[in-house]
Amino acid sequence: VCPHAVVRPVIMTNEEKAQILKSLDVDKMAIVDFTKDVMNMSANDFCVNILLNELHAKCICVGIDYRFGHKKEGGIEFLKSFCARNSIELQVIETKIFGEANRKVSSQWLRDLLQEGDMDTYLKLTNERPYQVSGVVSHGKRLGRKLGFPTINLIPQEIKTIPRFGVYATRVSIEGDANYYYGVTNVGQRPTVDTIKSHPEETVETFVFDYEGDCYDKNVRVDFIKFLRPESKFDGLIQLKEAVEKDKEKAALVHGIKM
């Protein structure tokens, strides 16, 4: 059961979660709209109305710190009692501890790492599952193509946690193509070319190595592997092009490929 994000940005959208669950051979995913009625629902009503009567749950799997229901009234002890009364199996996942400081792995820590651009630690905490941005490729200004490095442009969903603005070595998968491609991605507001806008939109622009196809209007997923540098404002397009060439070289080294 995946409530929609209403309070804080999400690391994965419901669509991205669905793709991961599909790869694990999960048959169905139920998305509960996080309305005011659901937000004010008691823990018992949620278990009875949603888990039992609607989903006919046979097994419930939650983290050890899981809280639910109005004002977070429900927890593990409540679930143990409810599951015992209704012959439902309950699996409680223990907290994962990481590092010498024995810090608890949490979604907030992962968000903090993304905003710091620390993909190295992020990958360690997620068992090497990269942060990703996915969506349909939009038609941009084609400025990259004019400068000699055409890019795939994605507009992240508003509910999505955006990593630190900057340049990353990335991996790209394209709808209808079984191959993975290596890339170099800029996340940010394109300060060199969008200086006139008072509130420039956040974009994810990716140059893909060794790809000649047309992926406009196709679904694309970009996996973030390593942070290379912060986003910068350059004096002009010539300086921007020179910086991109250096970014491509750095990304190629990360990927272990030759340009």
What is the meaning of each model-derived region?
Residues 29-31, 89-93, 223:
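General small-molecule cofactor/ligand-binding pocket signal
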Residues 1-86:
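N-terminal Rossmann-like or analogous alpha/beta NTP/dinucleotide-binding catalytic cores
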Residues 139-259:
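Phosphate/ribose-recognition catalytic cores of enzymes acting on nucleotide-derived substrates
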Residues 21, 60, 122, 170, ...:
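Residue-level signal for inorganic ion chemistry
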Residues 34, 95, 228:
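Hydrophobic pocket-lining residues within nucleotide cofactor-binding pockets
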Residues 16, 121-128, 239-250:
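A non-catalytic, amphipathic alpha-helix used as a structural packing/dimerization or gating element
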Residues 16, 45, 78, 109, ...:
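An acidic, carboxylate-rich microenvironment
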Residues 83-189:
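Glycine-rich, Lys/Arg-enriched anion-binding loops that position phosphate/diphosphate groups
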